[in-house]
Swiss-Prot record:
Organism (species): Caenorhabditis elegans
Function, as annotated: Probable ligand of isoforms a and b of the calcitonin receptor-like protein, pdfr-1, a G-protein coupled receptor. May not signal through isoform c of pdfr-1. Involved in locomotion; more specifically mate searching behavior of males, independent of nutritional status. Involved in regulating the male-specific expression of TGFbeta-like daf-7 in the ASJ chemosensory neurons. Plays a role in circadian rhythms of locomotor activity.
Secreted listed as a keyword: yes
Name the UniProt record assigns to this protein: Pigment dispersing factor homolog pdf-1
Keyword DNA-binding part of the UniProt annotation: no
Keywords: Secreted, Signal
Source organism, top-level taxon: Eukaryota
Amino acid sequence: MNRFIISMIALLAVFCAVSTASPLLYRAPQYQMYDDVQFVKRSNAELINGLIGMDLGKLSAVGKRSNAELINGLLSMNLNKLSGAGRR
């Protein structure tokens, strides 16, 4: 009787150890955030056409952002990197 209880406790301990260790053994590889991401490249002409097509009147009327906030956001964009990446 004592052997049976000891063997069941040992079996339970082995099962717990294996079930706890399996996520550590078979974990998906961790990647850097932007290592394998391909960025979509756009030329400056496409960027300017997109900005011209924005209806700032509707944006101001809705009240989600003021025009000053929108312009500040556009000024903070790094256009040098975009210009270098967009050449075809």
